[in-house]
């Protein structure tokens, strides 16, 4: 039985993992796989592989020495670990290099070439014949066309293809054919062909060769091939054949090969193949001059020479070491290499070529860098290359700005803890180079190993060992560069004292002290005495705030806790782990109800439970810090709140009695997704199982009421299945299997077991009886190229747990055949939403890393009605690319569907995803409004947000429609208002245009006749100007309905008098009085009166124009000479109802006399009227206006005019009149034609617009 690792074992494992990861972050990158040169046919795919260690190294590519980011990379797909050219073209041909970068620096791989395969045509030749003697050798020559890669030569011999050499026919490396022991059957035609193994092109020579066989007498032997000396280039370790074809008689003299005057075939690696010299593996010593000698009895008859040049790829012989340098110093690097021909040397710094400069001095195979800066830190590479290949060696250099002694920036703090608690002291220091930190106590340096504290000790055992010499150490250290933490578990009074942190580097040291105070245990167990005992350490070494639940039973009863000395520990032990009853998934996204029942108390009552929980990622790695909660012993459930939706959490729970803390119970659970109103059907969460708050009685059955039951192993005492194991490479034939344990079922885990199986095989045990302190094991002796899966089993006193989830398939290196289906893990469906009665919106997440970043071409979406059990009912939609949403259409209304997915590429499809159910909406009634369907296309870059929208999309669109309609209506109203204002302004402008301040009556002869009109009190203007009227030189007929604007409150009277006696014609003042005439208010605020219409025949010589109540005459009209008395117009005394105001009397003078009249009249003011202002439009400024209005009496009308529908209005332009009326004046006018529709109205009323 293995000793128990204790409740802090998971924490220790995570600390070791975190520290090892941090320590490896400063690792020099190195390539684990490098790209290889490739020849491909035009349009074919090309894949260049490149991987490096550490795994987080960044991979980039160079093309012909330029970064792909700086040049056009069209048609090239760069992904993690490989570069893919889907269709090879001329633009892709060139040299490629791979760069691996980390925080330390960057390294550059050797240059590889990507070229296009081709095969040229044979040169055009004419056919010829070859004659050979029977029994001798024949030589058939073939000039192979240029090809990439080198073409394979074939021969068509008498209608049959010869692809490889045989006993009789030798196809030489040069492509020529050597026929041995020629016979008559060998006669016929021969034709050579070239075959390209990449493009699979086969091209025939343009001519054929005819072989003739002679049975002639013996002839002299001769060398048929070659006929001239040859130079041959061969790479070291390649095979070489030096050709020498001898023809002649059936038997020829022997053939000898010499090298440097010595027989060449005497050497073991050099052999004769008929008359050819074959060297199996060329070495450097095989270079030199060779000769093929044909001899006869009389001496040497013929020979041919070969010069062999052995090409040797460069190699670097020296070993390099990392260098630590100081800023401002100098450094020298050398590169010892060899090769044939002599290699060229190129230096690179962090994958950038170094050119000679004042600071970089390059001489031969050495480089010297002076006055180093911090930027000179990194990786230096020496590249050597020649015609045979290339090689490189790298060396890391670190440049420190300045050296400095250590400085402790975060010293340990003195603390006061309870007996038996866990203590953490932390110390951080800086310095150049980074200092090393060690701890000291009163006994000296502390150097315990973590493995010594993996055994759990009870508090009783620890207390009983106080003062006992040779006790096991209970403290250990975890250190990395510049930082260290000292952990002391189950502290006792003996550990109290001073602890010193010492930081040391090459230039000095520094130290800081902290004092540790240990208080008795009974002081810490009282509810009112809270100490750091209940705090738990986070993975970063900091303490988190804790949440406490008051123990009401202890507070109310005030029962004192028993002291350690009050009760003997005989027969008592630590409590067993609580039995957690909660399901592994909660129905709420932000809360988990933790429920449990107590295990055996160990003979002492349980004082409290301690719950610690933290967040994990989907791979089981820690994300958040530990949160600690103290729960009273009387409780058996507690809600964990403020959790994140769709997240994985780990819970560690222990019970404490007077003897100490017992074994921990572990659990992992996942919170549910955050519900949204837009998703009607989501994946059903794992239902909870109701557990009463009272302690559960053993042996009582509990029904699930149709709910999914919890894993029965959780109540049987066996541990929970560990998490899915992760696999990492250990060597070419071994792997590391790592896992995370879960709840122990109430009994400590005693061991683990790892099983494995190969694809298509059975499960076998890889390792058994693994101590609980080990969470990783190496599995070796795996077959190269095999595909394996692994699983883990936890074991305690109750038995074995269920098998863990099977690991992802792992392929051992060395397997050359491509996998039939590299896509293993499919996408995960996140959300389904019924958009309409026939459409469902599907959203999913795909993680390329789950399939080793294997490229995919798209997704398959399968759906069928939920009530169907036939897989053939599934329909499939295909989504190309890397979209993460799709709209499934043409569905049945109000029908539930099962939906699942796969990802695929050209080699197959992945496993199925999770299955989701979603029901379409009910069918809409006819005429119901339908919201527009949104564009559901998304970019290729995935959005992995786990929180869906909280409001339906269509409501937002409807709101936009309403807002748009309101804004549109407001704009239309504003435009209408602007149009009305513009129209009103135009009318007023036209009004002012045709109503000048002074209205001029037109006629052939106009005298200075005065037309008098009345305005409201205080005003004498119409439309802002004094209005003046002019009458013609004639009489007004009795019935002429003209307005003369004489309205005042005086009594009616008729009077005539001469106003201007100096003129030939006198102007008479005339008044016309009518009772109760209608009055109108013009827009110039002038009260006027309209006269009743008389017989139109009496107005034949006068025309009315309804324009501000003034009467105009036609320009060609004349007035009568008879004087007509006009009654003054006034208000009747019976004018009641409204209040009437007196109207002002306004007189407008005008002097329009004949030329012989003197116009120097004076204007007297009426004594009974108020003085009024002279009109600004008076032609004679010297004249004044008299009270009243005179009407000129003229002769009878002698001229009539017909009633026309067109009225011509000619405004006068009057020149200034001099004081003497002797000179002639000319008036000009402009005709304006108006419609006369209003003139013929039966009752004339003048109205202003």
Swiss-Prot record:
<feature type="glycosylation site" description="N-linked (GlcNAc...) asparagine">
    <location>
        <position position="428"/>
    </location>
</feature>
<dbReference type="InterPro" id="IPR036179">
    <property type="entry name" value="Ig-like_dom_sf"/>
</dbReference>
<feature type="domain" description="Ig-like C2-type 3">
    <location>
        <begin position="217"/>
        <end position="307"/>
    </location>
</feature>
<feature type="domain" description="Ig-like C2-type 1">
    <location>
        <begin position="29"/>
        <end position="113"/>
    </location>
</feature>
<feature type="transmembrane region" description="Helical">
    <location>
        <begin position="958"/>
        <end position="978"/>
    </location>
</feature>
<dbReference type="InterPro" id="IPR003961">
    <property type="entry name" value="FN3_dom"/>
</dbReference>
<protein>
    <recommendedName>
        <fullName>Cell adhesion molecule-related/down-regulated by oncogenes</fullName>
    </recommendedName>
</protein>
<feature type="disulfide bond">
    <location>
        <begin position="427"/>
        <end position="501"/>
    </location>
</feature>
<feature type="domain" description="Fibronectin type-III 3">
    <location>
        <begin position="826"/>
        <end position="923"/>
    </location>
</feature>
<feature type="domain" description="Ig-like C2-type 2">
    <location>
        <begin position="120"/>
        <end position="212"/>
    </location>
</feature>
<feature type="glycosylation site" description="N-linked (GlcNAc...) asparagine">
    <location>
        <position position="870"/>
    </location>
</feature>
<keyword id="KW-0472">Membrane</keyword>
<keyword id="KW-0812">Transmembrane</keyword>
<feature type="region of interest" description="Disordered">
    <location>
        <begin position="1158"/>
        <end position="1202"/>
    </location>
</feature>
<feature type="disulfide bond">
    <location>
        <begin position="50"/>
        <end position="98"/>
    </location>
</feature>
<dbReference type="GO" id="GO:0005886">
    <property type="term" value="C:plasma membrane"/>
</dbReference>
<feature type="glycosylation site" description="N-linked (GlcNAc...) asparagine">
    <location>
        <position position="296"/>
    </location>
</feature>
<feature type="glycosylation site" description="N-linked (GlcNAc...) asparagine">
    <location>
        <position position="181"/>
    </location>
</feature>
<feature type="topological domain" description="Extracellular">
    <location>
        <begin position="26"/>
        <end position="957"/>
    </location>
</feature>
<feature type="compositionally biased region" description="Basic and acidic residues">
    <location>
        <begin position="545"/>
        <end position="566"/>
    </location>
</feature>
<dbReference type="GO" id="GO:0098609">
    <property type="term" value="P:cell-cell adhesion"/>
</dbReference>
<feature type="compositionally biased region" description="Acidic residues">
    <location>
        <begin position="1159"/>
        <end position="1168"/>
    </location>
</feature>
<feature type="compositionally biased region" description="Low complexity">
    <location>
        <begin position="937"/>
        <end position="952"/>
    </location>
</feature>
<feature type="glycosylation site" description="N-linked (GlcNAc...) asparagine">
    <location>
        <position position="344"/>
    </location>
</feature>
<feature type="glycosylation site" description="N-linked (GlcNAc...) asparagine">
    <location>
        <position position="289"/>
    </location>
</feature>
<comment type="function">
    <text>Component of a cell-surface receptor complex that mediates cell-cell interactions between muscle precursor cells. Promotes differentiation of myogenic cells.</text>
</comment>
<feature type="signal peptide">
    <location>
        <begin position="1"/>
        <end position="25"/>
    </location>
</feature>
<feature type="region of interest" description="Disordered">
    <location>
        <begin position="528"/>
        <end position="585"/>
    </location>
</feature>
<keyword id="KW-0130">Cell adhesion</keyword>
<feature type="compositionally biased region" description="Polar residues">
    <location>
        <begin position="1173"/>
        <end position="1189"/>
    </location>
</feature>
<dbReference type="InterPro" id="IPR013098">
    <property type="entry name" value="Ig_I-set"/>
</dbReference>
<feature type="domain" description="Fibronectin type-III 2">
    <location>
        <begin position="721"/>
        <end position="815"/>
    </location>
</feature>
<dbReference type="InterPro" id="IPR007110">
    <property type="entry name" value="Ig-like_dom"/>
</dbReference>
<keyword id="KW-1015">Disulfide bond</keyword>
<feature type="region of interest" description="Disordered">
    <location>
        <begin position="929"/>
        <end position="952"/>
    </location>
</feature>
<dbReference type="Pfam" id="PF07679">
    <property type="entry name" value="I-set"/>
</dbReference>
<dbReference type="Pfam" id="PF13927">
    <property type="entry name" value="Ig_3"/>
</dbReference>
<dbReference type="InterPro" id="IPR003599">
    <property type="entry name" value="Ig_sub"/>
</dbReference>
<feature type="disulfide bond">
    <location>
        <begin position="335"/>
        <end position="382"/>
    </location>
</feature>
<dbReference type="InterPro" id="IPR036116">
    <property type="entry name" value="FN3_sf"/>
</dbReference>
<dbReference type="InterPro" id="IPR013783">
    <property type="entry name" value="Ig-like_fold"/>
</dbReference>
<feature type="disulfide bond">
    <location>
        <begin position="244"/>
        <end position="292"/>
    </location>
</feature>
């Amino acid at each position: 039985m293995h000793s128990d690792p204790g409740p802090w074992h998971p924490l220790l494992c995570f600390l070791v993992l975190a520290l090892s990861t941090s320590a490896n972050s400063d690792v020099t990158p190195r390539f684990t796989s490098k790209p290889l040169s490739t020849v491909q046919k035009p349009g074919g795919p090309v894949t260049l592989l490149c991987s490096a260690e550490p795994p987080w190294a960044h991979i980039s590519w160079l093309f012909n020495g330029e970064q792909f980011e700086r040049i056009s990379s069209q048609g090239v797909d760069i992904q993690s670990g490989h570069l893919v050219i889907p269709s090879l073209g001329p633009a892709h041909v060139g040299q490629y290099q791979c760069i691996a970068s980390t925080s330390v620096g960057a390294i550059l791989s050797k240059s590889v070439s990507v070229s296009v395969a081709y095969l040229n045509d044979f040169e055009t030749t004419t056919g010829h014949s070859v004659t050979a003697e029977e029994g001798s050798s024949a030589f058939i020559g073939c000039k192979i066309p240029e090809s990439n890669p080198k073409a394979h030569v074939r021969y068509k011999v008498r209608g049959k293809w010869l692809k490889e050499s045989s006993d009789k026919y030798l196809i030489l490396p040069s492509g020529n054919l050597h026929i041995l022991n020629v016979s008559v059957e060998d006669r016929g035609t021969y034709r050579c062909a070239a075959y390209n193994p990449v493009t699979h092109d086969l091209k025939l020579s343009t001519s054929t060769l005819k072989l003739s066989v002679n049975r002639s007498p013996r002839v002299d032997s001769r060398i048929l091939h070659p006929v001239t000396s040859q130079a041959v280039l061969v790479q070291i370790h390649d095979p070489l054949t030096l050709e020498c074809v001898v023809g002649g008689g059936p038997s020829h003299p022997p053939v000898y090969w010499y090298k440097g005057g010595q027989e060449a075939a005497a050497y073991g690696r050099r052999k004769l193949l008929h008359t050819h010299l074959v060297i199996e593996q060329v070495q450097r010593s095989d270079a030199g001059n060779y000769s093929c000698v044909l001899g006869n009895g009389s001496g040497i008859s013929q020979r041919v020479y070969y010069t062999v040049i052995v090409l040797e790829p460069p190699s670097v012989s020296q070993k390099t070491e990392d260098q630590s340098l100081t800023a401002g110093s100098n450094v020298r690097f050398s590169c010892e290499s060899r090769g044939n021909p002599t290699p060229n040397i190129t230096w690179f710094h962090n994958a950038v070529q170094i050119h000679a400069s004042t600071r970089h001095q390059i001489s031969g195979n050495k480089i010297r860098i002076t006055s180093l800066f911090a930027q000179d830190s990194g990786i230096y590479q020496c590249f050597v290359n020649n015609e045979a290949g290339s090689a490189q060696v790298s060396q890391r250099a670190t440049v420190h700005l300045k050296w400095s002694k250590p400085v402790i920036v975060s010293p340990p703090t003195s603390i006061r803890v309870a007996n038996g608690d866990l203590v953490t002291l932390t110390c951080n220091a800086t310095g150049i180079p980074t200092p090393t930190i060690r701890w000291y106590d009163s006994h000296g340096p502390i150097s315990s190993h973590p493995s010594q504290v993996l055994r759990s000790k009870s508090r009783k055992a620890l207390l009983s060992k106080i003062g006992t010499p040779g006790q096991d150490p209970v403290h250990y250290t975890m250190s990395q560069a510049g930082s260290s933490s000292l952990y002391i578990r189950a502290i006792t009074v003996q550990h109290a004292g001073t602890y010193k942190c010492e930081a040391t580097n090459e230039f000095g040291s520094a130290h800081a002290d902290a004092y540790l105070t240990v208080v008795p245990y009974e002081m810490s167990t009282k509810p009112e005495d809270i100490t750091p005992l209940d705090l738990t350490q986070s993975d970063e070494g900091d303490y988190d705030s804790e949440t406490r639940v008051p123990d009401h039973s202890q507070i109310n009863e005030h029962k004192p806790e028993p002291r350690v000395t009050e009760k003997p520990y005989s027969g008592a032990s630590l409590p067993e782990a609580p039995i957690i009853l909660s399901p592994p998934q909660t129905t709420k996204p932000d809360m988990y109800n933790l429920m449990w029942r107590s295990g055996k108390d160990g003979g002492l009552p349980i004082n409290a439970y301690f719950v610690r929980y933290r967040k994990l990622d989907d791979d089981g790695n820690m994300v958040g810090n530990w949160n600690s909660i103290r729960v009273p012993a009387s409780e058996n459930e507690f809600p964990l709140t403020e959790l994140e939706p769709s997240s994985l959490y780990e819970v560690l729970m222990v019970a404490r009695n007077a003897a100490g803390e017992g074994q921990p119970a572990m659990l992992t659970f996942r919170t549910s997704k955050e519900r949204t109103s837009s998703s009607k059907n989501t994946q059903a969460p794992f239902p909870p199982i109701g557990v009463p708050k009272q302690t559960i009685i053993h042996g009582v059955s509990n029904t699930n009421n149709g709910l999914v039951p919890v894993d029965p192993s959780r109540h049987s005492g066996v541990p929970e299945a560990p998490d899915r194991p992760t696999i990492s490479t250990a060597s070419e034939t071994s792997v590391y299997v790592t896992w995370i344990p879960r709840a122990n079922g109430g009994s400590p885990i005693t061991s683990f077991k790892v099983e494995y199986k190969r694809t298509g095989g059975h499960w076998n045990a890889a390792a058994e009886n693994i101590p609980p302190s080990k969470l990783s094991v190496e599995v070796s002796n795996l077959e190269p190229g095999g595909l394996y899966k692994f699983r883990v089993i936890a074991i305690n006193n109750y038995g074995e747990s269920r098998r863990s989830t099977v690991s992802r398939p792992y392929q051992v290196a060395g397997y050359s055949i491509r996998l039939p289906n590299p896509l293993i893990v499919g996408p995960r469906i996140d959300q389904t939403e019924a958009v309409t009665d026939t459409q469902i919106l599907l959203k999913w997440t795909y993680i390329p890393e789950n399939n080793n970043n294997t490229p995919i071409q798209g997704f398959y979406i399968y759906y069928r009605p939920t009530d169907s059990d036939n897989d053939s009912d599934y329909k499939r939609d295909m989504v190309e690319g890397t979209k993460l949403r799709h709209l499934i259409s043409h569905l049945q209304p109000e029908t539930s569907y099962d939906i699942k997915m796969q990802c695929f590429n050209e080699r197959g499809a992945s496993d199925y995803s999770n299955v989701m159910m979603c029901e379409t909406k009910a069918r809409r009634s006819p005429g119901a409004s339908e919201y527009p369907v949104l564009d559901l296309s998304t970019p290729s870059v995935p959005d992995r947000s786990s929180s869906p929208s909280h409001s339906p999309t269509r409501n937002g669109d409807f709101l936009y429609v309403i807002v748009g309609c309101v804004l549109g209506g407001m704009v239309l109203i504003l435009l209408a208002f602007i149009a009305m204002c513009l129209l009103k302004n135009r009318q007023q402008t036209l009004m002012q245009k045709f109503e000048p301040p002074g209205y001029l009556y037109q006629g052939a002869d106009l005298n200075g006749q005065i037309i008098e009109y009345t305005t409201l009190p205080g005003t004498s203007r119409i439309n802002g100007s004094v209005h003046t009227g002019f009458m013609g030189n004639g009489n007004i007929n009795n019935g002429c309905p003209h307005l003369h604007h004489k309205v005042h409150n005086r009594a009616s009277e008729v009077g005539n008098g001469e106003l201007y006696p100096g003129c030939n014609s006198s102007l008479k003042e005339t008044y016309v009085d009518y009772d109760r005439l209608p009055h109108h208010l013009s827009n110039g605020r002038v009260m006027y009166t309209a006269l009743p219409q008389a017989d139109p025949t009496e107005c034949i010589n006068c025309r009315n124009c309804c324009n501000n109540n003034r009467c105009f005459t036609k320009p060609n009209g004349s007035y009568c000479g008879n004087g007509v008395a006009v009654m003054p117009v006034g208000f009747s005394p019976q004018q009641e109802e409204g209040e009437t105001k007196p109207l002002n009397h306004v007189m407008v003078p005008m002097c329009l006399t004949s030329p012989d009249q003197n116009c120097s009249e004076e204007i007297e003011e009426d004594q009974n009227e108020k003085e009024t202002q002279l009109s600004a439009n008076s032609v004679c400024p010297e004249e004044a206006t008299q009270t009243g209005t005179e009407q000129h009496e003229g002769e009878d009308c002698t001229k009539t005019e017909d009633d026309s529908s067109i009225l011509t209005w000619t405004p006068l332009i009057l020149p200034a009149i001099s004081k003497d009326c002797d000179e002639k004046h000319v008036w000009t006018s402009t005709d304006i034609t108006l419609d006369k529709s209003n003139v013929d109205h039966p009752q004339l009323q003048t109205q202003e617009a």
